[in-house]
C-alpha cells in the first residue's frame, strides 16, 4: 500500500497484478514463491525478450558472457582467424545451450549489412546473435470428458 503496509495476496490477486506486468510473491504451501513472469514493460511491450523475466535474464547473460569472453580480443588486429574464432566460440556455446535444453536456438553470424568497408576500416565489427530461450509456461489448459463408449469396450459388450 502507499503507506508501506504489507499485504498478503492470494493466487487470484497475484494473477491479476501479473496481468498488469507486476510480479508478486505468493504463499504456496509453506513457502513464498515469485508469482508472475512478466517484466514491468508488459502489457504495453509484448516482445518476448523484453516482456518475460526468464527470457530477459537469458539475454542479459548471453550479452555479458559475450563481452567478457571477448574482452581480451579488443585492440588486437582483426583477421579472418580471429573473426571466425569469435563466431565459432559463440556457436559452440550455443550448441551446448541447445543440447542441454536451455534454449531452442543460439547462433551468431557476422552482420554483413553493417560490416561495411568504412566500418571495417574504423575497426568496428558487427555480429548478429539469434537466440530463442524458452518462454515460461504461463497457463496449462486441460479439458476432461467422460467417455461413455469406453464402458462398452471395458465390459466386452
Feature annotation, model-predicted:
Residues 1-86, 132-157:
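Long, contiguous, structured domain-core segments that constitute the functional module of a protein
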Residues 5, 13, 104-106, 125-127:
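Structural beta-strand/beta-sheet cores of well-ordered domains, especially the beta-sheet scaffolds
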Residues 18, 48, 94, 111-117:
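Residue-level detector of functional hotspots within protein domains
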Residues 62, 108-110, 127-129:
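Generic structural hydrophobic/aromatic packing signal, biased to beta-strands
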Residues 84-106:
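Short, hydrophobic/π-rich interface segment
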Residues 87-91, 95, 115, 119, ...:
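Short alpha-helical interface elements
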Residues 101-123:
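Long, charged, glycine-rich C-terminal linkers/tails
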Residues 119-136:
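Long, well-structured alpha-helical subdomains associated
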